[in-house]
Each structure stands twice: as structure tokens, then as C-alpha cells.
Amino acid sequence: MLNKKCFVLDLDGTVYLGDIPIQETVDFILRHWDTIDFHFLSNNTSKAPTTYVNKLTRMGIPATLDRILSPVTPLIAHLRGNGIRTVYPVGNRDFVACLRERMPELNVLDYGVSEGAEAVVLAYDTELTYEKLTHAALLLQNPEVAYLATHPDLVCPSPQGPLPDAGSFMSLFETATGRRPQHIFGKPDP
């Protein structure tokens, strides 16, 4: 295994659980930092990539932003490549801020405002409300509105136990609207 030149490690449940480092993994990374190219992958879109850099740094891992892989990157490429300019997000404030930062030309509708949405973008929403669900479900009843999801994880690991994640929300929307996302950007999807 040590003859590999690059490792891509998941974060939640592999490098840490919540704010608790998984010490064996951290020790392995630090022991081989100078000889192996480490990158870190997370489907968890409820936190900005800079949050992951800061968390890893606090654990002693000298990570930089270019080593963090997130489904937001291919999502933005898809939005740009398909000329989607207005989205209704089902995601928390950090996710919305990340969309606005990475694609300033994107019109990210405020919650409760759904007029003009070209796509519903579903992420891991730690601030989910019934109002968000209602607006998204009504939008998804229109086949002209694209349905995109950042990742299919059913649960997110936490120290308290598994928590509902975007895949669980996808099941909710499928039950309510009959639709599944046209594109899913996080692992294990392409």
C-alpha cells in the first residue's frame, strides 16, 4: 500500500467523527505526509471547504484548499456548462455561501422565493425546514425545472449516531413528487 503516490481519503468517519480525530488515520497521514500526496474528499456540503482545511489543520494535518474535494466543484461546472443561472437551493447557509462565492453570476434564490428557478439543488441541509421542503416539492412538480443533488448519502456519521443526509431527502422528494435527481455529483456517482 505504501508504494502508492496518492491517497484520497474520505473525511467524515475516516479521518474524524464530528470533531474527534480518528487518531490512527491522523497518525498515518502525518507519518507519510512528505512521501504520499494526500487529498481529502467529503460529500458533506453543509460545511465550506475552508472549514475542512481549518479542522484538519487543528488536527496537525497541513491541508490546503486545493487538497479538498467536494461535489460542489462538479455541480458548479454542470450549472455553468448547461447555462443554469437561477437555482432554488435545499441546503444550509454555508452551502448557499459556497455557491455564491464559487459562481458569483448565479442567482441563488432566497428561501421562500421560487419564481424563476431553473433548478432545485439538493444538498445536505442541517437547517432544513418544512417551508424549504414545500417550495422545492412544488418546483419539482414542473418537469422544466432541473433536479440536481450534490450526493446520495442516506446518512451522515456523527458522534451521536447516523443523521439523515441528502439521500434521505432524495427519498422524501421522490415519494412526494415522483422525481429522482437528473444528476448526482458526489461519490459514488460519476
Language model feature labels by segment:
Residues 1-11, 15-190:
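HAD-like aspartate-dependent phosphatase fold
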